[in-house]
Amino acid sequence: MGWLFLKVLLAGVSFSGFLYPLVDFCISGKTRGQKPNFVIILADDMGWGDLGANWAETKDTANLDKMASEGMRFVDFHAAASTCSPSRASLLTGRLGLRNGVTRNFAVTSVGGLPLNETTLAEVLQQAGYVTGIIGKWHLGHHGSYHPNFRGFDYYFGIPYSHDMGCTDTPGYNHPPCPACPQGDGPSRNLQRDCYTDVALPLYENLNIVEQPVNLSSLAQKYAEKATQFIQRASTSGRPFLLYVALAHMHVPLPVTQLPAAPRGRSLYGAGLWEMDSLVGQIKDKVDHTVKENTFLWFTGDNGPWAQKCELAGSVGPFTGFWQTRQGGSPAKQTTWEGGHRVPALAYWPGRVPVNVTSTALLSVLDIFPTVVALAQASLPQGRRFDGVDVSEVLFGRSQPGHRVLFHPNSGAAGEFGALQTVRLERYKAFYITGGARACDGSTGPELQHKFPLIFNLEDDTAEAVPLERGGAEYQAVLPEVRKVLADVLQDIANDNISSADYTQDPSVTPCCNPYQIACRCQAA
């Protein structure tokens, strides 16, 4: 109890005009040059085809494309799940949802979050002497000890969950459109079933709500400012740092940008991509001007585009899941089709990561945890097993193919949440359950069980259009190995130290800075 009180007390101490916990940035610089810094940037609902370096039709990612030319681009990189909370939990633990307990999204009223017996990447690096910060969306529990300040992050600035989970006065663009927060004593204007609640979206700095509702139009620039301030302060101190930037882009609602250089004539989605790219460019520029030689920057996404948002959703590129679209529904976010989990990914570290390299290694967001831990000269937590692996050899251009096998869990489209219903085995992909998420036209594909899995050869069929013939030699050669690797991982999980998330809901835990005001309004700090 005393430790908890101390953490709460320290989290509110102010330095240089913005809140920081009482982190000793001024410890001796003896670690400088010995341990690398890490900046991990995670986009939200960004499609594989939204990166210009991946897909020539995209023209709005100049900074990311430049990063690709200055580093390594991964074209077979996968989120660990196809929706928000499970993907983020796997990034921070290196473990699938069946191990870490997070198999579906947390709500505004969620009592729990990422189970407290799971060790986060931030906690490991904090113990190794790192200063740790998160800027952006958390979505792994906001109540009590689930808050990021108690999960290894010294500094937090951001929103506790997706920005469509609370109203704002700057609602931006959504499909269907959503109203602004109610004003004064007026009745609720939230009549759309798909729109957020009338409780305003909060913006946190550490444990304090500093703005409710948050201004979505200026949020990206605030993130850029806080991220660059954190990098400057940490680099000046001589201590190594971990900065995790979890962007609001490209999740809906798309903001009305306030950046003065915003281009005209682009689509709403293209303008959002441009703003996101500008934000990433500001962070990279700060790294380049302060800690370039000793900082590893990793950019990727949490899952594929949210197709039901129609023109406000991104591009899956060539990964169109054509077999599923013929059945109905979307093969993107929430599904185990390639469009749901194959995401853009870039690595940048001058002098360490080779320049202008395209890697076809099979990699995953799960690999971030063990790779960063290894590069930080830290140790993996004991008493548990990990699904990610250290991929340093791939990053540094040495010979290593990455994973031979990946497992894709159900993220809401079909089957039981978290169930490993799809197996990637080298070039092959086997589906034991298929189903589409809600598409722009409102359709959802039927949930279909496949005792004999559908198997696609992704090298020949990136669109996942035509499965192998069940009686053919190629299918018969692959099937036994698919069955074996799936049985092996399920047995491994059964023998592991696994966790269970608390998905209990209670309206009293809803973040609210002023319960006496409609929509929980309070003044911005």
Curated annotation (Swiss-Prot):
Inhibited by phosphate. The phosphate forms a covalent bond with the active site 3-oxoalanine. GO terms for molecular function: arylsulfatase activity; metal ion binding; N-sulfoglucosamine-3-sulfatase activity. The lineage of its organism: Eukaryota, Metazoa, Chordata, Craniata, Vertebrata. This is Arylsulfatase G. Most efficient at 45-50 degrees Celsius. Keywords: Calcium, Deafness, Disease variant, Disulfide bond, Glycoprotein, Hydrolase, Lysosome, Metal-binding, Retinitis pigmentosa, Signal, Usher syndrome. It is found in: Lysosome. It is an enzyme of class 3 (hydrolase). Binds 1 Ca(2+) ion per subunit. Displays arylsulfatase activity at acidic pH towards artificial substrates, such as p-nitrocatechol sulfate and also, but with a lower activity towards p-nitrophenyl sulfate and 4-methylumbelliferyl sulfate. Catalyzes the hydrolysis of the 3-sulfate groups of the N-sulfo-D-glucosamine 3-O-sulfate units of heparin. It is linked to Usher syndrome 4: A form of Usher syndrome, a genetically heterogeneous condition characterized by the association of retinitis pigmentosa with sensorineural deafness. Age at onset and differences in auditory and vestibular function distinguish different types of Usher syndrome. USH4 is characterized by late onset of retinitis pigmentosa and usually late-onset of progressive sensorineural hearing loss without vestibular involvement. USH4 inheritance is autosomal recessive. Its EC number is 3.1.6.1, 3.1.6.15. CDD domains: ARSG. It comes from Homo sapiens (Human).
